[in-house]
Amino acid sequence: MQVKIDTREKFHAITIQDPVLAANMTEELEQCLLPFLQKEVKNVVLILKDTSEVDDAAAESLVKIQQGFYDDSASFVICELTPGVEKSLEDSGLLELMNVTPTESEAWDIIHLEEIERELFNE
């Protein structure tokens, strides 16, 4: 699996550079994303602009990974879905379970709001 990682102040922007995210890549996906939970900056924005197909098993894995981030008080936002991937996720009923934004900028806004929310609930 090809990825590009850009580290920002409050999150890591990870771009999947493979055209297909398939079931046989779920373990590799977890191995790529879950270690970020051990870093000081835990938040992840997953950019899927180069991915034209995500099968159901890979999508279910993304939902589980996202839940793992939220269980560990970190944000996980997916952005820049291609229309085909968005339709596929919607048809499978998984899109509504995911934290998805159209752009990386909006993903940053979500992370910022979730950080404020976590601070308020921890007081």
Predicted regions, residues:
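STAS-typified acidic loop motif
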Residues: 2-37
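General small-molecule cofactor/ligand-binding pocket signal
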Residues: 6, 79, 101
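Residues that form or immediately flank small-molecule/cofactor binding pockets and catalytic motifs
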Residues: 10, 83, 105
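Structural signal for conserved beta-strand scaffold positions within catalytic alpha/beta enzyme cores
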Residues: 15, 100-102
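Amphipathic alpha-helical interaction surfaces in cytosolic regulatory modules
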Residues: 26-98
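A charged, well-structured terminal subsegment
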Residues: 102-123
